[in-house]
Amino acid sequence: MTPRHIAVQQARRIVVKIGSSSLTREDGGLDLNRIDSVARLVSAKARRGCEILIVSSGAVAAGLEPLGLSSRPKDLASVQAAAAMGQGYLMARWSSAFQAHHLHVAQILLTAADVMQREHYTNAMSALDKLLAFGVVPIINENDAVTTREVRFGDNDRLAAYVAQMVGADVLVLLTDVDGLCTAPPSQPGARLITEVYATDELGGIDVRGAGSSVGTGGMATKLHAASMAQHGGIGVILTSADRLNEVLDGQPVGTWFEPTRNRPASRTLWIAHVAPSAGQILIDAGARRAITRGKKSLLPAGITDVLGVFSAGEVIDIVDDSGLIARGISRYDSDSLAKLMGHKQEEKQKEHMRPAVHRDDLAVLVQE
C-alpha cells in the first residue's frame, strides 16, 4: 500500500474542503446533487469510524440568485449581503442531505480574527472537538457577513488548512474543479499532473495562474499555499477534482498527494508558525540561525542585528536573515528593549543578555537544515 492509501485508511480525522466552483451549477445556483453526493460519501466514511469536518464555500454563490445578481459582486457590502442571504440556504441543504443518512450537522462560522487570537482559537478547537465527540458533522465557513477587507481569510483553502491544524486532522482534502496540481495551467498543451509533492520539493517555477472561477475567490496558488501549510504541520493533503471524492476517501491514487512532514508540531507551535499575526521583525546573524535551526536552542539578544517595527513583549514576531523568513516566535522583550540589548556582550549587561529574546518553547522554526 502507498503512504497515501495508508494515511486515508487509518485516518482518525479528515477535513474536506469544497469550493464554490464545485458547489454551483453553470447558471450560478447551488448544485444540490453535488451536496447530496458529498453527504452520502462522507456519511459512509463516518460509519467506518472516521470523524469528518467539511469546510464549505458557497454562501455567497447561494445568495446571488435571491438578490438578483448574475455574478459575484466586487464591493464588500454586496458580498456580505449575498453571504448573509445564502448561508442559511446553504446550511439547510447540508442539513437535509446529511439527515438522509441519519447524521446531524452544525454550523461553525469563523473569521480571521477568531483564529489569530489564541483564546478564540482554543475555544473554537474545543467546540469542534466536542461536536465530533457527539457524532456531529461540522460545516465550517468564513463569516463573510462580518469580515473586513483588511482582516479576512480571503479564501476557504487557507481556512481549511487552519481548521485541519486546529483539530489535529490526519488528512486534508482540497476539492476543486481540476484534477490536481499540474506543471502548467491544465488548459495549456503539455500540462502534466504532479502526483506527489514532498516538503522539500521546490515548486516556485510552476505556473499556477488561471485556475479561479467567477463564483469563488481561491485559485491554484492559494490551494498550493494551504497544502504546503498543512503539509509542514504533519498533515497529508490531497488536491483533486470534486468528482473524485469517492476515490479519495477510498485511498486511491487520484489528484496530487502532499506527503506530510514526519514530525507533527504541537498545536501551539502551529498557531505561532502559521496563524498568529506578526507584530514586528528581527534580523539575526549566521550564528543565531545555526543555534535555533540546528541546535534547537533559544534565540539570545546577542545574535540579533536589527529590530524592525514596534511590538510588545508577548507578541509574535518574524525572525529573518538575509535569505528570508527563518522562524516565528513570541518575543520576551518589547522592541525598544530588544533594540538596546541586541548584539551586546558587555559584562554589565551579561545577566540581561543571557535571557532569551525568544525562548525555544515559544519558537516555530520554518526552515529545514
Predicted feature locations:
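C-terminal catalytic "cap/lid" subdomain
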Residues: 2-72, 76-104, 108-369
